[in-house]
Amino acid sequence: SFTVPNYVVVSADSVVPGSTKGESGFIANITQISTEQTGKESLHNNKVANAEKQLNGEFIDPDLEEPWMNEADFDAEEGWSYYPVWVEWVNQNQDAPNPVGNFSANNGYEDEYIPNIPGWYDSTDGIAGEYLALLQLDEGAYTLGVNSDDGFRATIGVNYNDVLAQEIGVFDGGRGASDSIFDILITKAGLYPFRVLWFEGGGGANIEIFSVVDGEKILINDPDVDGAIKAFIPKGATVDEQIMERDATTGRAAVVSITPASGQKRVESASSIEVVIEN
């Protein structure tokens, strides 16, 4: 007997033109709201929905009636901002180079620090970030994985802000460094917009993004491994400087919000439905 993996069939409509491809690598967009501002270890409480809320700058300081400061932007003074960073691959750990996860100095992959962490107040807690890339994928089946402390959500969609993007992997909660493995099926070769939301409440913090080939774990975009999945940042995206709004885009129109939100409770039957589409 044999077991057929439970593949997510990725929509071929997500493929973007080759003209969107920038340099090799990922964009790491890290945010932090720690106990030094709020008195709480984290505001997102290790939940996907709240991590998205933090990343969007939607947690409000009740005294100033403005968003809390992003401690992972060293140029921040007040309010919400971002400081996206280019990385070649994703093998990060708050205690680098101490070994955590599958890839470490023990097997030739010394852990790297999480960009801009510790933040303003020297904390390593209350983090929510995203890792963005265009993955070059051929037709066929792929096994992907994320090793994380704490949780994550991986998606493929027409654009990075696409709320209708396909979820291909998720761990919605807190945990120590652990693997989540998931399978996808590609029916059309091309560049696919890939996003991993990652978050950490307190204690340890790490993330690795990889594929699995014949039982071997391979970092996505490892230039030293033949056949490693290649990743590229979208052309024109800002890196290594402060921005007030995230600008990584594929140029494709996407649904960026739906009101009422999925799962929202106590919605009046007469309430209107609002869908916002942005290019």
Task: State where each predicted segment sits.
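N-terminal non-catalytic regions of secreted/periplasmic and cell-surface proteins
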Residues: 2-7, 248-279
